[in-house]
């Protein structure tokens, strides 16, 4: 819920349109065990004050009549629904954060690989990059799936993060 509220105000906070569009999230379930998992997630969301719904097959047919219910490869039993959920344009979001960081004095170097991290006593002293060395007093890692690699490079041990492939189907209007 907290995350969703942050997204709802992010364009205003960054003074940059991140193109956040709340169109709901409907997660179909195709087996009794998937239904149980959806019910578990639904209950967790409700306990945290997030509006969520569990739809049985009749609710689903009433709300989304155009799905292929009869000839679907996997039987559709129902869905977990979060009506306020949505998505944002990833590139707009990145540029909004980059512009905000720049206005706070952050230097952003694109296409620049970190090759090493120099520590003195218990502090990071410099970052070695494919473009040379950068002396610094503060470091922030914002590199998505590569964060754990840099964390180890800095000698900070293992982060409990696993990277997983994510596929998205993105469409844009052709003009």
In which residue ranges do the predicted regions lie?
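Central helical "cap/lid" subdomain
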Residues: 129, 133-175
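Dinucleotide-binding Rossmann-like beta1-alpha1 core, especially the glycine-rich loop
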Residues: 1-66
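Internal, well-ordered alpha-helical segments in soluble enzyme and binding-protein domains
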Residues: 3, 37, 41, 56-59, ...
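Short aromatic/hydrophobic contact patches that present stacked aromatics
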Residues: 25-27, 79-82, 168
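Residues that scaffold the ATP/ADP-binding catalytic core of kinase and kinase-like folds
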Residues: 63, 117, 150-153
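Alpha-helical scaffold segments in soluble metabolic enzymes
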Residues: 6-9, 40, 96, 100-103, ...
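Helical element adjacent to the flavin cofactor pocket in flavoenzyme catalytic cores
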Residues: 75, 79-138
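Generic secondary-structure signature for well-ordered alpha-helical cores
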Residues: 5, 9-12, 47-50, 65, ...
């Amino acid at each position: 819920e907290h995350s969703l509220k942050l997204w709802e105000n992010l364009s205003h906070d960054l003074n940059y349109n991140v193109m956040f569009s709340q169109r709901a999230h409907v997660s179909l379930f195709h087996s009794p065990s998937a239904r149980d998992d959806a019910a578990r997630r639904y209950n967790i969301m409700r306990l945290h004050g997030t509006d969520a719904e569990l739809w049985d097959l009749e609710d689903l047919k009433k709300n989304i009549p155009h799905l292929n219910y009869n000839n679907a490869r996997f039987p559709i039993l129902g869905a977990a629904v979060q009506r306020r959920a949505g998505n944002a344009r990833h590139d707009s979001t990145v540029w909004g954060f980059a512009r905000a960081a720049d206005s706070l004095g952050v230097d952003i170097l694109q296409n620049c690989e970190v090759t090493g991290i120099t520590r003195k006593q218990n502090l990071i002293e410099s970052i070695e990059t494919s473009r040379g060395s950068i002396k610094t007093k503060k470091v922030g890692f914002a590199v998505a799936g590569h964060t754990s690699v840099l964390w180890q490079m800095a000698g900070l041990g293992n982060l409990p993060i696993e990277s997983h492939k994510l596929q998205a189907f993105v469409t844009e209007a052709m003009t």
